[in-house]
Amino acid sequence: MRLARTTACVLGLLGASSLSIVVFAGPAIGKASHAGWPSINGHLKMHKTDRSGTIRGSSRSDELLGGHGNDVILGGTASDVIWGDYKPCCQPTHQHDVLLGGNGRDFIYASHGYNHIEAGAGNDVVHGHFGHGKIDCGSGHDVVDVSHRSRHRYKIRHCERIR
């Protein structure tokens, strides 16, 4: 994947002890690494701290990555890849994430905590192997991948296929 530029952006300073940083990298050109994912031709946006915050997608296909805090991640109008928590270790179960796919064929991955997921329009794929909460697939022909262990922890609506 080739990145044109990388910029660190301070989203908010709410007093001396609260700072949220999101890294914007892009526009990216290329194919993301997982089979079936859209070509990421928008931005890579991620929470680099464990603070709570909001990430908004663009009109292009973006990869939007939340951290260990309480994240609100809003997909844009194209096909996006959304992660409730991208960090591979120390997965907290106390976080509360809101993951909204928007239009397009979105790929959404739940965090280990509480997840409120609305996939939106498009033929979306939602992965709820971890955590608990609500998954509403919205319109389109959607697929939810959820482990047998986690299935009873989610209230699942409007999903054409659960596997």
Q: Where are the predicted features?
A:
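Secretory targeting and sorting signals
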Residues: R2-P27
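Secreted/extracellular small peptides and ectodomain modules produced from precursors
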Residues: T7, K87-P88, I135, R157
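Secreted/luminal cysteine- and crosslink-motif detector
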Residues: V10, C90-Q91, G138, E160
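N-terminal segments that cap or nucleate solenoid repeat domains
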Residues: G26-I82
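Glycine-centered beta-turn/loop sites at beta-strand termini
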Residues: G42, K48, G57, G66, ...
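All-beta strand scaffolds that present successive hydrophobic residues in beta-strands
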Residues: D50-S52, L99, I117, I135, ...
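Leucine-rich solenoid repeat scaffolds
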Residues: H129-R163
